Amino acid sequence: MFQLPVNNLGSLRKARKTVKKILSDIGLEYCKEHIEDFKQFEPNDFYLKNTTWEDVGLWDPSLTKNQDYRTKPFCCSACPFSSKFFSAYKSHFRNVHSEDFENRILLNCPYCTFNADKKTLETHIKIFHAPNSSAPSSSLSTFKDKNKNDGLKPKQADNVEQAVYYCKKCTYRDPLYEIVRKHIYREHFQHVAAPYIAKAGEKSLNGAVSLGTNAREECNIHCKRCLFMPKSYEALVQHVIEDHERIGYQVTAMIGHTNVVVPRAKPLMLIAPKPQEKKSMGLPPRISSLASGNVRSLPSQQMVNRLSIPKPNLNSTGVNMMSNVHLQQNNYGVKSVGQSYGVGQSVRLGLGGNAPVSIPQQSQSVKQLLPSGNGRSYGLGAEQRPPAAARYSLQTANTSSLPPGQVKSPSVSQSQASRVLGQSSSKPPPAATGPPPSNHCATQKWKICTICNELFPENVYSVHFEKEHKAEKVPAVANYIMKIHNFTSKCLYCNRYLPTDTLLNHMLIHGLSCPYCRSTFNDVEKMAAHMRMVHIDEEMGPKTDSTLSFDLTLQQGSHTNIHLLVTTYNLRDAPAESVAYHAQNNAPVPPKPQPKVQEKADVPVKSSPQAAVPYKKDVGKTLCPLCFSILKGPISDALAHHLRERHQVIQTVHPVEKKLTYKCIHCLGVYTSNMTASTITLHLVHCRGVGKTQNGQDKTNAPSRLNQSPGLAPVKRTYEQMEFPLLKKRKLEDENDSPGCFEEKPEEPVVLALDPKGHEDDSYEARKSFLTKYFNKQPYPTRREIEKLAASLWLWKSDIASHFSNKRKKCVRDCEKYKPGVLLGFNMKELNKVKHEMDFDAEWLFENHDEKASRVNASKTVDKKLNLGKEDDSFSDSFEHLEEESNGSGGPFDPVFEVEPKIPSDNAEEPVPKVIPEGALESEKLDQKEEEDGSKYETIHLTEERAKLMHDASDSEVDQDDVVEWKDGASPSESGPGSRQVSDFEDNTCEMKPGTWSDESSQSEDARSSKPAAKKKATVQDDTEQLKWKNSSYGKVEGFWSKDQSQWENASENAERLPNPQIEWQNSTIDSEDGEQFDSMTDGVADPMHGSLTGVKLSSQQA
């Protein structure tokens, strides 16, 4: 199947798979809709079961391997290989499928992007690139079309197959391999050779070679590095590529080879021109590198014989100028033009790239002059070429001649060291004549306008673009772009070299800055609108060598054309504090300690021009070229500081490669220009200077050596170039590392929690085990600790940081899962000195961690709780238990502390203080016993669950009283002075812990039984007891706790005589006499009692 050549095959191939799927879905839906219509024609199951693929076709599709769709254009039919490049595909075919290489390999069509095997390509060329002659017509246009196609009319007998080499970048073709290789040297590697080329006796600009008007000046160029003197420019480029850059493989990869079937060229008659037309311009035999473009028609009086060669957006091609401006069809498919035209008639040639060439005709009898063996013309290409310009020597007796005034052709510089435009002054011979000698200077750079395709000198181009096309001039700043030469720039953010055609898109990714207000834009249209609105009256600075210009057409309508002028970073004109200046010079001397306010010191700036980096400190964000982290601050400060601190390198220029690279701050070794961050890490592992400088392995004498040895000056960090906010922020971050002076802090050695010496030779698991031990000592290591551990243990810093992070996460998960208690004990004696009231949270409990004492207390308390309901137990038994408990707890002053069992409750947040003195405990138990006998309150029936819950001696009625008060919403003062005194006593002596309730019924029962007990407590002491408490000292407290039973019995009898104690306590006030006496009593006993408490700690664990 043959079809017309299609462009944009890459885009079509990407969508082809989706289109096929859509079409298959449509076909499937169609089949489903019409399955009923065709059911009558369907054979029965017998035929379906007994039919095989061999009955239908010659092959079984089930045996064919289903190959995935390949989106790359060059696909091997014998294996799954596919490639985007023809050279890789051809190499694969030659190496793997060499048995039938010539017939099966895909070939490129020399006229379009069609690819096919040899036989199919021949048919393709015959059908599409050799059109039949059109029918004769009387009209002039038909006559012109007929004459244009005369040279392309193939005859079957005249077709020949010719092997040609071609340039894959611009489709330049030639049968000779050397010619194509020289073309590539001359046209596509100027940017590589330019830094090496120098001219004798003249200093070049930006590494370019100044071009003279004499052809012999081409031999004056030489290589800067090795002083090689070539015979030609191509020889010098070849020398640079093969000897210095060593990229000769790139040249070989750019040369392709194919066999093309083309019509045989007809012999041409060579006739001398008329005498009045002897002045003509001789063209070289091989001018295929000239780009076709607009050639303006000029009157015949103008004798300036220069050829217009617009380069951008045009194709590399060659045109043979023949008699009557006849472009004869040759072996490479250049179309021809008819011969019969009137004087002054203009013929437009449709060349590649939509660039018509207008050539005026002055005579019908201008004959072609071609010497034998030298005439060669080349086909047109379809690829765009980079904007480059060339000069060519115009020699006599070479190819063809044109009368003067036919073509205006301004000489254009193809490259900075290309061929020189020479003018011959000899008398023209009959066969071919050259123009008269010209004295015009040929060193002027020319640029082509991308809109009108006209050539202009570089100094007037911007004026033309601004006035003729009403272009708007928009200035911008890109300090991160370093202009290497006219075709290549380097991005300091990404540390990569960028060609001109992709430079603008790359700059828009980082953003262009406004030169007036420091705003950053990622869109040219928005930046132009910003300039029109905000800075319409601002004056632009002068254009420098580092300025890049871009001509853009944004949209149709007003302000369509934009002339963008981007000021970039220039290494020569950079100020002293710039990145490259520090890179090429020695590291700065460590600054002297200064006061904190003066840390932002004035940096001395050279008197060199500042135009190259006018706003060096205005870039808001900087991208590290090694780790791609975003840094805030100016380039030269933030980036240099980040490289020194994070990567331990400083920027420099490689002494051999002359490229921007880095050197180690420890051993001052220089890295190669293609290094990465991993290269630095690998070097630091083996660097001998690491342990002697910043990482602080020599902890004892590190500060003294730093002060004495000037060679270690780069180790000390220089903060004088930093902004003050950065200094303040860094100081806050580093406060935990050192409490000393900020400027001396970087020199302080790192003190590790565990010494890693001796573990560097251990296994990986052993070193990880050491890190786990270190984590148990120091779970939050600083950055410098991690760096020192990495250097000592030969581990990556990322591995160490990840290990610590994983351990911390595991600890957090375990805390959430197991809910461990964190004990935060405090001094009860000091706590008692606090005068104001303290409100402990509901989740805090008080525990006694003396296990032996608490175990005894718990067992005895359970016995007492279970015997509460038995009437045969006497009060004396209870008091004996009390004395045994006080003796068993380790001292006469210790109150009873018990651990409450953690039972799930419905209301876990109600605070229940669980610690009271033993005397109050026994009196409350007696009150509870009397309440059970009386009829004031309902009888409380203790179940087994209640018995289990109340096996703590600390479950007192005082606690329950507080719970009832908080639950009912009443203030503590409403319960009367007695309960207030007891609660104050507990607050001053004990900690709290949340109590738990088994259910609501038990809670209400405790509440009902707690009120009368709490209200009877304050009256159990008489006046004698109160006087004892007031005058008691540390030694007298024991007597209070060991009072005889008669005193407690009298107190209980007095309590029984109280009529309706609940009403009395509700009517009483906090300022009663008994309350004051009880306060004084607690003040006397609290200090000695707290001094004897051991093991009382605060737990954050909730029940």
Curated annotation (Swiss-Prot):
Residue stretches of biased makeup (Polar residues): 393-423, 692-710, 972-982
Zinc fingers typed C2H2-type, residue spans: 74-97, 107-129, 165-188, 221-244, 447-469, 489-510, 512-535, 622-647, 662-686
Region (Neuroprotective peptide (NAP)) residue spans: 354-361
Modified residues (Asymmetric dimethylarginine): R348
Modified residues (N6-acetyllysine): K1036, K1043
Segments of this protein annotated with the region Disordered: 133-154, 360-439, 691-712, 873-1029, 1045-1103
Annotated positions of the Phosphoserine modification: 98, 409, 413, 608, 709, 738, 805, 876, 878, 886, 889, 905, 954, 956, 1072
Any single GO BP term: estrous cycle
Family annotation (CDD domains): homeodomain
Compositional bias (Pro residues): 427-438
Keyword Acetylation included in the entry's annotation: yes
GO-annotated molecular function: beta-catenin binding; beta-tubulin binding; chromatin binding; copper ion binding; DNA-binding transcription factor activity, RNA polymerase II-specific; peptide binding; RNA polymerase II transcription regulatory region sequence-specific DNA binding; zinc ion binding
Location of the protein in the cell: Nucleus; Chromosome
Induction profile: By the neuroprotective peptide VIP.
InterPro entries: ADNP/ADNP2 (IPR038861), ADNP_Znf (IPR045762), HD (IPR001356), Homeodomain-like_sf (IPR009057), Znf_C2H2_type (IPR013087)
Binding region for DNA: 754-814
Keywords tagged on the record: Acetylation, Chromosome, DNA-binding, Homeobox, Isopeptide bond, Metal-binding, Methylation, Nucleus, Phosphoprotein, Repeat, Transcription, Transcription regulation, Ubl conjugation, Zinc, Zinc-finger
Record cross-link Glycyl lysine isopeptide (Lys-Gly) (interchain with G-Cter in SUMO2), residues: 39, 72, 144, 155, 203, 231, 266, 274, 278-279, 311, 335, 367, 408, 427, 600, 606, 616, 621, 632, 658, 699, 716, 728, 731, 745, 807, 829, 835, 914, 929, 936, 1017, 1036, 1043
Record field: compositional bias (Basic and acidic residues): 143-154, 922-954
GO cellular component: axon; chromosome; dendrite; extracellular space; neuronal cell body; nucleus; RNA polymerase II transcription regulator complex
PANTHER family for this protein: ACTIVITY-DEPENDENT NEUROPROTECTOR HOMEOBOX PROTEIN, NEUROPROTECTIVE PEPTIDE-CONTAINING PROTEIN
Function: May be involved in transcriptional regulation. May mediate some of the neuroprotective peptide VIP-associated effects involving normal growth and cancer proliferation. Positively modulates WNT-beta-catenin/CTNN1B signaling, acting by regulating phosphorylation of, and thereby stabilizing, CTNNB1. May be required for neural induction and neuronal differentiation. May be involved in erythroid differentiation.
Quaternary structure, from the entry: Interacts (via N-terminal region) with beta-catenin/CTNNB1 (via the central armadillo domains); interaction is direct and stabilizes CTNNB1 by modulating its phosphorylation by glycogen synthase kinase-3 beta GSK3B.
Name this protein carries in UniProt: Activity-dependent neuroprotector homeobox protein
Species annotation: Rattus norvegicus
